[in-house]
Amino acid sequence: MVAGLPARRSRLRPSRVRLVPGSAPAPGLGQRGRFRLVQLAVAFFALCSLHADDEVPDFQENYLLGDWAGYRTTLWERGINPEFLFIADPYGNPYGGFSQGFTVYSMFCADLKLDTEKLLSLPGGEFHIGFAVNFGTQLSQRFIGNVFPVQSSDVAPPGPRLTDLSYTQALFDGKLSLRAGRLSIDSLYGEEFAASEYFRAMTSVAFNAIPFAIFYNSPGAFGYPATTWGARAKFAPVEEFYGMAGIYNGDPDVGLANRYGVDFTFNGPPFGIAEIGWKRNQRKTDTGLPGNLKIGGFVLGGTTQKFNSDSTGGGRYGLYLVGDQVLARFGNRAENRHLGVFGSLVVAPDEAVSPMPYYFGTGLVAYGPLDRRPKDILAIGLAYGAYSSRLRDVRQTQQRTDPPIKPQSYEMTVELSYSILVVPGFTLQPGAQILINPGGVPSTPGALALGVNAVVSF
């Protein structure tokens, strides 16, 4: 979030129009009046926007190339914040799936954030433009056949695309955040809807970055790097509570790989999502163990073809619950070393249109499990998704005349991984995933996936 200037009292007074004796009042504001309105608008944003100390980020601590010989700090002081991220996932399945194989799938992301206070004297604002390209071969699609992608970069098909093209404005000391433009409901940096920092400790897309079933049940929900036109508002009247809601263009064709993120059409149907959240023990003065609880719902407008008939039904909808809780602290508290638990639940109850009506995920994450490795992360998680009974009935009927069609029951992923901070800005996360009922098909052999998730922040 962009920091604003210290609070200032506005010295602006209402505009006065001088009249020449015998003349009529000016029909409009005039140039001077319009300029004064612009001044008043800027003053309003200055008084309402977030106010905080302007601290220089620790570039040496967070990026492989550090401060770029001082150029990064210079850019930041001028309101320009570039971000570069590279993710590579060399993974293979020595057992199970359609067949055995090894692939590397990767994603490169470039983002530019512009601080409007430093550039335009408008506190609390941020322009964001982003680009991403995925390349390589997706292990889950090519060799295993599971729905929960193994590789963390397997969030989009191969190809380049424009990602974010948005503006965010913070108002009222950061209590209100407004965002509009080309958006997704999750975020590469920070958090949007249905998020938990614990999800990012996992490699499998079943967990990371938000529960997979939200996207699977609602094709109008866009997740990074796919974006669509939308607007989001978040209001946090106190530190412990917030509410947020967003409305987006839910046309799934906008996110197709061959549109490259530049399909700016607005054909709908609308996709809406809303969430309320509670934060526990997260003030600087709190001594208890922190936790989060989030409850939300989503709906895709329009009509949807029902699985078990030629008729159409209403839009898809669902509810979700996300929570995490620190269980124990260890070591130096300033290092934020702790053991925590997370959980998520997604219910899309209309089985006539929702392919995975029930999903849950849970796990344990240890941040800094070893005294000598305070930045390493040990994680174990389980994700389960149950397929629609209506869809299963349809496929069982179709299988009688078309044997290759396979009815789906459930799919489950169990992951164990250990993230190693090699140097600042470069992590290696070796991991193992057990994949049960890949694609929800019991006849597909369960698989074991082994590999490494490599992440470089430049």
List each language-model region with its residue ranges.
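N-terminal periplasmic/intermembrane-space "pro-region" immediately following the signal or transit peptide
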Residues: 2, 41-89, 93, 117-121
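Transmembrane beta-strand segments of Gram-negative outer membrane beta-barrel proteins
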Residues: 57-58, 72-95, 127-129, 137, ...
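Short loop/turn motifs that connect adjacent beta-strands in outer-membrane beta-barrel proteins
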Residues: 66-82, 115-127, 172-175, 240, ...
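Transmembrane beta-barrel strands of outer-membrane/channel proteins
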Residues: 82-90, 127-133, 178-182, 243-249, ...
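Outer membrane beta-barrel
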Residues: 101-217, 221-252, 353-361, 366-394
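Long, well-ordered mid-to-C-terminal structural blocks that present hydrophobic/aromatic surfaces
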Residues: 281-373
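Outer-membrane beta-barrel "beta-signal"
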Residues: 446-458
